[in-house]
A protein has these predicted regions:
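Membrane-embedded segments
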Residues: 67-146, 150, 155
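Short beta-strand/loop motif that positions the catalytic acidic residue
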Residues: 221-223, 228-230, 234
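Acidic catalytic loop of the alpha/beta-hydrolase fold
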Residues: 232-237, 264-265
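An N-terminal hydrophobic leader/cap segment in hydrolases
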Residues: 21-63, 292
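Short alpha-helix in the alpha/beta-hydrolase fold that links the catalytic acid
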Residues: 104, 215, 224, 238-247
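Hydrolase active-site cap/lid region
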Residues: 166-224, 268, 272
Length: 300
């Protein structure tokens, strides 16, 4: 074998090893990002019955991982006070599953909503081990399909997202024209800007980020009215992020900033203001011109 041939074989082997190492490194980075972002919680310690709410268990089929197996997403359906109640898809944030979101779900039900709430894959009783951005979007879309079956009238279909769930809800609203109204609470502009806000600004996060959740780029495409809610003392997600999302969103839109509210207690601190903002928003949606509702009536 000539020196050139041996050199070529060595180079090919080195390139193959580099490709494997690079792929392994990318897979590791992706896994660690998903772990850091979602921090999925399994233990279900309470149900809607613990809060005096009637409910039904919901199981939704979604696409599985690369092996092609099907997976199931678990949720709760909490009927409204009457047949004309607005119906809301509840999308929670990171770290906490549905059982830790029941206080917020109960409050929305108290305001008159029927609620369909789901756990993303990896959370609660849903299948899967570690969710991804794409899978969270898929799970929300499957839940929206179920909401359509539960509520035939598109004028009464709403989506709500808290924190990370707000990013999922914004993506959902860009995919579906039949979202009558969107409520996002304590949410962020993008994962890259969240990394900056948490002190990683000197690290080239954009070069390695695999989970983007870029709501600031997407919110301009949302056709539904949007209500943004944020506490001014939120130490996890700066309220300024909701202000920027509000500025980027098309009309009609509303913004409620709750003085001294933190990441989770906005409605508790200022329930009257919170409820008034939600009711005003429902009236805004109800009173939209017929032409603006036409595409929603067709679905998406």
């Amino acid at each position: 074998m000539t020196m050139r041939a041996r050199g070529g074989r060595w180079l090919a082997a080195a390139m193959a090893a580099l490709a494997v190492a690079s792929a392994a490194g990318c897979a590791y980075l992706d896994t660690k990002q998903r772990e850091w972002i979602f921090r999925a919680q399994r233990d279900i310690h309470s149900t809607p019955a613990s809060y005096g709410l009637p409910f039904e268990e919901v199981w939704l089929a979604v696409a599985g991982d690369a092996d092609g197996a099907r997976a199931r997403v678990h949720g709760w359906w909490i009927p409204g006070p009457d047949a004309t109640a607005p119906t809301l898809l509840y999308l929670h944030g990171a770290r906490r599953n549905l059982s830790d979101n029941l206080f917020r779900i109960q409050r929305l039900h108290r305001m008159g909503f029927a609620v369909l709430a789901i756990d993303y894959r990896g959370f609660g009783r849903s299948d899967g081990e570690l969710p991804s951005e794409a899978q969270a979007y898929e799970d929300a879309q499957a839940a929206w399909q179920q909401l359509r079956r539960l509520e035939p009238d598109p004028r009464r279909r709403f989506a709500y997202g808290h924190s990370l769930g707000g990013a999922v809800a914004i993506e959902l609203a860009t995919r579906n024209d039949d979202v009558a109204g969107l409520i996002v609470e304590s949410t962020f502009t993008s994962m890259a800007e969240m990394a900056d806000a948490m002190g990683y600004g000197n690290f080239p996060i954009g070069l390695v980020l695999t989970q983007h959740f870029d709501s600031l780029a997407k919110v301009r495409a949302v056709k539904a009215p949007v209500l943004f809610i944020h506490g001014t003392s939120d130490r996890f997600v700066p309220a300024e992020m909701s202000e920027r999302l509000y500025a980027a969103a098309p009309e009609p839109k509303r913004l409620l900033l709750v003085e001294s509210g933190n990441h989770s207690n906005v409605a508790t601190m200022a329930f009257d203001k919170y409820q008034a903002a939600v009711r005003d928003f429902l009236a805004l949606v109800r009173d939209r011109p017929a032409r603006a509702r036409a595409s929603a009536d067709r679905g998406g």
